[in-house]
Regions:
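Detector for long, hydrophilic, low-complexity intrinsically disordered regions
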Residues: 3, 147, 176-178
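Hydrophobic ligand-binding cavity/cleft-lining segments
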Residues: 1-73
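Hydrophobic residues positioned within well-ordered beta-strands of beta-sheet architectures
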Residues: 8-10, 76, 94, 119, ...
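Short, highly charged C-terminal tails/helix-capping segments
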Residues: 166-178
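Beta-strand/loop substructures that line and gate deep hydrophobic ligand-binding cavities in soluble
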Residues: 97-158
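Short, surface-exposed beta-strand/loop "edge" segments at domain boundaries and coil↔beta transitions
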Residues: 80-92, 115-119
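Short beta-strand segments that buttress and anchor functional surface loops
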Residues: 75-85, 106-112
Length: 178
């Protein structure tokens, strides 16, 4: 009753000459993926315990996990600005769950206050048979309190270009360093 859902989708063209497999491999590099988060101040691997549900892709997302690629989890600390100009910053600790899919990665982020973001990051072909090139697609479903949905959605909408740019820059760098 007090929970709301929002969908957000961001698409960035992948420059010509970058193979799809290279872009997919980048998305499946979980630690690099985390490092693209502009708010991240710390992260560490978090093994699954017997009481944790095994991360999986929810039904209805039209993607399947890669067989033989076990899910990976991390605990990530983000520094979030609660007031402008850094007058009041807050560290938010979230659990990131990564499930590799054929053309990218599914990421579930579980944050405090019941905020859950489920994202499919894929490399897709543009046009008929990919004739128009490739694109990086970020498709997010946000679920949280109605009171927070606008703030969470705004945060997703405000920083996506920088994240995508960092990924594209990494793909274009011939020696593979960020």
């Amino acid at each position: 009753m007090f929970t709301s859902t929002a969908n957000v989708k961001h698409v960035t063209p992948i420059p010509a000459g970058i193979p799809a497999l290279k872009a997919i491999s980048l998305l499946q590099g979980h630690e690099f993926f985390i490092k693209c988060d502009p708010h991240m101040v710390h992260y560490e691997a978090s093994p699954l315990s017997d009481k944790d549900p095994v991360p999986s892709v929810p039904a209805g997302r039209d993607v399947q996990p890669v067989v033989g690629a076990p899910p990976k989890c991390f605990v990530v600390t983000d520094r979030v600005h609660a007031l402008p100009a850094g007058l009041w910053d807050s560290d938010v600790v979230s659990r990131y769950e990564f499930v590799d899919i054929a053309r990218g990665v599914f990421v579930r982020i579980r944050s405090p206050l019941g905020v859950v973001m489920e994202s499919v990051w894929e490399v897709r072909e543009k046009g008929e048979g990919g004739a128009a090139g490739l694109e990086l697609v970020e498709d997010i479903v946000i679920t949280c309190s109605r009171l927070l949905i606008g703030t969470v959605k705004s945060t997703c909408d405000s920083g996506w270009q920088g994240i995508h740019l960092k990924m594209i820059d990494h793909l274009q760098n011939a020696d593979g360093r960020a």
